[in-house]
Amino acid sequence: MQLHILNNPKDAALAADAEFLKQSLFNLLHEEASPLVVETVKLLSTSDDSAALIEKVLPQLDEQQTHDLTLACGLFAQILNIAEDVHHERRRQIHEEAGRGGAEGSLTETVRRLKAGKADGKSVQRQLDNTSVTAVLTAHPTEVQRQTVLSFNRRIRALLPQRERCTNADALARLRREIDTILLGLWQTSETRRHKLSVNDEINNGVSIFPMSFFEALPKLYRKMEHDFQTAYPGVRVPDILKIGGWIGGDRDGNPFVSAETLRFAFRRHADAVFRFYRGELDKLYRELPLSIRRVKVNGDVTALSDKSPDEEIARAEEPYRRAIAYIMARAMGKARALGLGMGCKFGFLEPYASAQEFLDDLKKLQRSLIDNGSRLLAEGRLADLIRSVSVFGFHMMPLDLRQHAGKHADVVAELFQHAGLEDYNRLNEEQKQTALLRELSHQRPLYSPFITYSDHTRHELAIFNEARKIKDEFGEDAVTQSIISNCEQPSDLLALALLLKETGLLAVENGKPHSRINIVPLFETIEALENACPVMETMFRLDWYDALLESRGNIQEIMLGYSDSNKDGGYVTSSWCLYQAELGLVELFKKYDVRMRLFHGRGGSVGRGGGPSYQAILAQPAGSVAGQIRITEQGEVITAKYADPGNAQRNLETLVAATLEASILPDKKDPDAKLMQALSDVSFKYYRELITHPDFIDYFLQTSPIQEIATLNLGSRPASRKTLARIQDLRAIPWVFSWMQNRLMLPAWYGFGSAVETLCEDKPETLAALREHAQSNPFFQAMLSNMEQVMAKTDITLAENYAGLSESPDKAKIIFGMIKEEYRRSRKALLDLLQTEELLRDNRSLARSLALRIPYLNALNGLQVAMLKRLRKEPDNPHALLMVHLTINGVAQGLRNTG
């Protein structure tokens, strides 16, 4: 391990942690692996070309030794990730304890900037009252590690900070033994999934993050928000501006296994987790509030609750708060029982709360009484956190969005029309579709008949909407609030969904006016769809019927923007600029029609799917596009990295809130030069499309990446492609990006950029100067270049050339790889030129350090992957080769800390 990289005194603890974990891992290898494997791993830690070292050593290794070496390299990547995460948290705590104010991206710093920007208390309160920030957890299959492996990692992470606190050799030895034990368990556990995840597995994984992290992190963050705002702006209240949402169990786009049953299962699991949390907190409150009427006064509201208590113990006769809490717990658990949850209550069960608001009202009675009668500290502790939790989580824990492809909605509408004796929907043009749909939406008459046998697809789709209605009735109106139309291209796509909502009781029509219980959310994903977003929405806003629908939903229209497909379609530069332009146009359009806009950003973890630091990404949005309303998807490895630990979760959620408020209250920013950006986009698009439409490109991609092996990794419940893979457009964005990361090209995040800059700046120094100026001062262009810089720092063209050698057509591969290699050279040169630096990551010491530590093991894993892919292509039925490819895919993903 290259610990000389950690020569900054601030990194001394990281160096010590890394060395400590490294020694534990070598202890394990000495016991479990052959001397040749141990020696090879030692050589890798100091090698300048670990892939070449692997190529030299591999012929000497048998299958078991190859397996052990692969696993060891992956484990080194894991422990370095853990050491870095612990160090980041350590530095944050040191920063806070030193009283240096908030770091960039913290609420403390954002509040300071608001104050410095002359924002007054009234404007801040107004903005808080109109702010809604949601991190939406999705089941996108990008987490390569099993939950079992993640659990081992969390245990090591929890133990590692103790190393600094060990005051003697015995304490250090005990810690060493604990970590050695965990590493042994990790070594002897299968790294890969043997079976494909089911939707229910994904639901369980998603739910697990709440007791692990969110139930602790959100109340703490709200308490910090209250402190920061009230310190700067006395009297300012913090409403429920931050929530967690989800797709897991409701997203059926491309996933035939999501059904009404999985939706119901999801909410039962949600409710089970949140009611267990409430029961635990109420039990703790019961123990913490033995206040006696001999010592304190009590408000009449609490006395009334106490009088209805099922807690009849004589010892409680003078303890009204405990008796009231027993009553509240019995009613809350009564609701849990009514929802079919199998959990008990030591006080028995009383009449269930009809809503989370009723539960909340009773808790607030306790709080008010404590404050009124001299017990404010008790009111502002656990009880305040529980009140906030109930307000945020309700009975449903997190709302789930529904999502389906526009074409699937249209298929259901067509069948309903057919059986009702109406027009042939599929033969109608767009204008005729709108007319027919509006006609059916203008009155109460349903099209569906229970006496007709419909296709499996139609029954399946209508069942999900019907189940969503029942869930809203049982778990609360906020349980399901959005229905997203993926691949939305026309106004009829929105009206078709509206008709399905009407057919299933989620949208009612009274006196010709609609009232919806759910938001209709178009998702614009491709370059063409993004360019057409404004015309589609303007058509909708001109409809009196839709205007009335929006009125029933608070006059807010949510728009989802897809980063993944637009990037796959047009490349990173063009995708970024099209998204920016779409937002600019939508801001003006919504102003024109006086509709409030909420943007939902469908970002992945990788730059090729819209990823990158959230703080910079939000601040880079066009002025007026945030306005306090934002939703962002979080998936797979991003959920693990950001939210699996309460401290990490609090910090990352704080960043989302801070950036949203800063972008909303201090939105004064200059848009990039549209003419310059459009020219950059046009040329970049041209070169990107030339590559991916080359007749030999698809074969090159399939043969020189582990795309087909990724499909067998059992990462998620849905298929890797929507249909048989013959074209790039048929491939899902996640495996597309995942594969380019594995072969170390990261092509979707930079291809075309270099040629665009070179073309525009040729003999035009003023254009180069303009681009450099944008690189220094424009948030949009800065974020684009920063993301590109991070990706190019992980790109290794030499390793990528080894993958090119896997092609079955060397002459054709030479041409395609030649195009890629030349574009990489141009793009790297252009990036350095615009950043006016001679090396990548010069100003990002943290990432540079991180990569330098992991690169020996990462490159070794790539070397192993190429060798095993070569063997697997020759011997397709070789189980050892396939397992090794799977292990290297896991290891490379961990080393890069990204998948798709």
From Swiss-Prot:
It comes from the Bacteria. It holds the Pfam family PEPcase. GO terms for biological process: carbon fixation; oxaloacetate metabolic process; tricarboxylic acid cycle. The keyword Lyase applies. Its EC number is 4.1.1.31. It is an enzyme of class 4 (lyase). The active site is at residues 140, 568. Its cofactor is Mg(2+). PROSITE patterns: PEPCASE_1, PEPCASE_2. It catalyses: oxaloacetate + phosphate = phosphoenolpyruvate + hydrogencarbonate. GO terms for molecular function: magnesium ion binding; phosphoenolpyruvate carboxylase activity. One of its GO terms (cellular component) is cytosol. Keywords: Carbon dioxide fixation, Lyase, Magnesium. NCBIfam families: PRK00009.1. Forms oxaloacetate, a four-carbon dicarboxylic acid source for the tricarboxylic acid cycle. Belongs to the PEPCase type 1 family. This is Phosphoenolpyruvate carboxylase. It comes from Neisseria meningitidis serogroup B (strain ATCC BAA-335 / MC58). The lineage of its organism: Bacteria, Pseudomonadati, Pseudomonadota, Betaproteobacteria, Neisseriales.
